[in-house]
Amino acid sequence: MIYLTQRLDHAHPITASVTLPIDLRVKSRARVALNDGREAGLMLPRGLLLRGGDLLTTDDGSEVIEVIAAPESVSVVRCADPFLLARACYHLGNRHVPLQIMPGELRYHHDHVLDDMLRQFGLEVTFASLPFEPEAGAYTSDAHSHSHSHAHSH
């Protein structure tokens, strides 16, 4: 088994790739199958969020593995009105929904209840199978490390 222990911050020749959904790209420890069929173990620093295009390597640098963000079942909201998109972000964020935010577009894991809520705001929501790259705050180790004992309303 290949042990991937660090993320590279600059280009290297790629020896293999691994396609991972977001649920595995947020784990520091996991057993995964490379796209060529070999087994690999993720042994990464805690709190590291892997993105599509990231490069991982072994301690000795003998392997350089490219991370590919797997297509996932997502709801897609497209809208030219920044106010409506901001309103959607507010309501989804208030529910702690991991959210990918792009100019004129939002993505979140498909959820028909959330879809219906946003449609009531006048937004068009579609379903797709696309890579999901949420904002880091939804998944990094410090995103919810604060105590909820302080006063704020949800």
Model-derived features: positions:
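Short glycine-/aliphatic-rich beta-strand segments at the starts of folded cytosolic domains
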Residues: 65-79
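Intrinsically disordered, low-complexity, positively charged segments
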Residues: 1-49
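Conserved, well-structured core segments that form or line functional sites
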Residues: 81-127, 131
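Generic recognition of long tandem-repeat/solenoid scaffolds
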Residues: 32, 76-77, 106-109
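Short, flexible, solvent-exposed loop/turn segments with mixed acidic/basic and small polar residues
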Residues: 29-33, 63-69, 88-99
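Helix-rich terminal scaffold detector
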Residues: 1-13, 36, 109, 113-154
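A generic structural signal for residues embedded in beta-strands
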Residues: 42, 57-58
